A protein has these predicted regions:
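Basic/polar low-complexity intrinsically disordered segments
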Residues: 1-244
């Protein structure tokens, strides 16, 4: 479902189409001297705005998809880490090595001394801080799992018969975690850039769709009059500026 803010951007573009339709209906009377207010320019701006809205929607869908993929990729991590630790515990690893492994496993489980279980935050957040914390959580999980692999690789008797516990399988799983995390980071950047581009087209000072729409209204008011039927047709068409 689209967020309220995304609906607001799309509504601005839809209302701009309505504004153009009224201006077109005024015929030759609508003939502003300013190029940016002329019908050809308005139609170009409308088409560009439509493209920007579509680009943001596509980028968001991609971001949502790879975010879900990452969550699925990381789901087996905790149980796998437990299996690794349990197998390691029955090897001839030193007490220190087992203690180090326990520390890493606790981090992967989200456990810390004196604290409750702490999982990566949900991906629904929209603030930069929420995204940053989430990214750090997944980065940390990936790094700790890599450390786990390094640790068990140093133990000669770590030779499990279970395929999923072999160093080869663990390394492949670690690579899949890295890939899933990188895909989210790249999609996040693309989504952010798409929003920046859209906001520039819709809300840039003087040249953005909202400011241009305001100027169109002023022009119609000037040529037809504040109490004219023509101005009343468009004066109520609402355009909402971006909240800073």
């Amino acid at each position: 479902m689209s967020s309220t803010s995304e609906v607001g951007h799309a509504k601005n573009v839809a209302n701009f189409e309505d504004l153009i339709a009224y201006c077109t209906a005024y015929g030759s009377t609508y003939n502003p001297p300013k190029p940016a207010l002329q019908l050809a320019s308005l139609n170009t701006l409308y088409t560009t705005a439509q493209t920007e809205i579509s680009n943001v929607a596509t980028a968001k869908n991609t971001f949502d998809t790879v975010t879900g993929d990452r969550q699925l990729a990381f789901e087996p991590l905790k149980s796998l880490a437990t299996k690794i630790f349990n197998f390691l515990s029955v090897t001839d690893a030193t007490d220190k090595t087992i203690a180090d492994a326990r520390t890493i496993n606790n981090k992967l489980q989200g456990r810390r001394a004196g604290s409750t279980t702490e999982n990566p935050p949900p991906e629904g957040g929209t603030t930069q801080n929420t995204t940053s914390v989430s990214r750090q959580s997944y980065d940390s999980l990936t790094e700790n799992f890599s450390a786990f692999i390094d640790l068990v690789s140093s133990i000669p008797t770590y030779t499990p018969n279970e395929t999923e516990l072999t160093i080869t399988s663990l390394t492949a799983f670690h690579t899949s975690l890295q890939t899933a995390n990188t895909n989210v980071i790249n999609a996040e950047v693309a989504y952010s850039n798409a929003r920046i581009s859209r906001d520039n087209v819709l809300y840039a000072k003087d040249t953005g769709l909202v400011d241009v729409a305001s100027d169109v209204k002023k022009y119609v008011k000037a040529i037809f009059g504040a109490t004219s039927s023509q101005y009343k047709q468009i004066s109520g068409i609402k355009f909402t500026n971006r909240k800073e």
